[in-house]
Design a protein with these regions (language model features):
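Catalytic-core regions of core metabolic enzymes
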Residues: 1-260
Length: 260
């Protein structure tokens, strides 16, 4: 799928490096906490066909699978990192991964500009510059992962029902709401192509994901849950392309009041 089929004025980043990865490494895999085990179990439940590597220097085995001390110890370069590590270690890990040849990461860790902490904003800017320099793409930080139904790549960290394939693509700027929506929709028989929790959007943003879904042939309807659109002009360019392809875009705007 070409990243520039819509307009010479807009070129999306390679979302497919993230959503269509053929191997993953869970960096910060652990028997402690619900998210590391949740991600592993969701990948297994979805029958992800690629290799799933576990990385944590404090373990030699987790979930009856071998655990490696670091990225360099892996038998191959993973295409996508699922990162559950302290904020202070994230940037150096991305730098190392990019040098090894990894192209994408989902970063669950917070501390990258979502609050008023100026150090967090500095970390977010450093991550953006690192991604721009290396071509690395990131979902998040401070996100809850994604679902790629065609690939069986489910990086969501909490339990979900066994989703079925269908025509709906989702992009949510609220990770918790995404989990509730896919559960509720599944109970009503609705199936999906891709569903993304975009987090802080330091690298990939809503417009990149939307462009991917507009070009994705099996996605017929797109639903967005939006707090804000950072690139309104590019958003309109992509939305016009969706209109040409008869793909409806449904937008749910998150409120800012106490009532929502």
């Amino acid at each position: 799928m070409s990243p520039n089929t819509q307009s010479e004025t807009f070129k999306r980043k390679p979302v497919e490096n993230l959503l269509s990865a053929r191997s993953v490494a869970i960096v910060g895999a652990s028997t402690k906490g619900r998210w590391p085990s949740g991600i592993y179990r969701n990948l297994k439940a979805a029958k992800f066909p690629g290799n799933i590597y576990l990385i944590n220097p404090n373990y030699t085995e987790i979930f009856d699978d071998k655990c490696y001390p670091n990225l360099a110890a892996l038998p191959e370069v993973p295409e996508h990192l699922l990162m559950l590590i302290p904020t202070r270690a994230v940037l150096s890990t991305i730098e190392e991964a990019a040098k090894l040849g990894t192209k994408a990461a989902t970063i669950y860790s917070a501390g990258f500009g979502e609050g008023e902490d100026p150090k967090g904003k500095d970390r977010a800017q450093a991550m953006k510059e690192l991604c721009d320099r290396t071509g690395f793409v990131v979902c998040g930080p401070n996100c809850m992962g994604s679902f790629s139904l065609p690939e069986g790549l489910w990086s969501f960290p909490t339990p979900v029902p066994l989703l079925k394939k269908g025509p709906v693509g989702l992009i949510f700027q609220s990770g918790g709401s995404l989990g509730n929506w896919v559960k509720g929709a599944s109970e009503r028989g609705i199936g999906f192509t891709y569903a993304v929790s975009s987090g802080n959007e330091v690298s990939l943003d809503l417009v990149d994901y939307l462009s991917f879904l507009v070009d994705e042939p099996d996605t017929k309807v797109i639903t967005l849950m939006v707090e804000g659109i950072r690139r309104p002009q590019e958003f309109m360019t992509v939305a016009e392309e969706a209109l040409k392809k008869n793909k409806p875009i449904l937008v749910v705007k998150l409120g800012r009041s106490e009532m929502g």
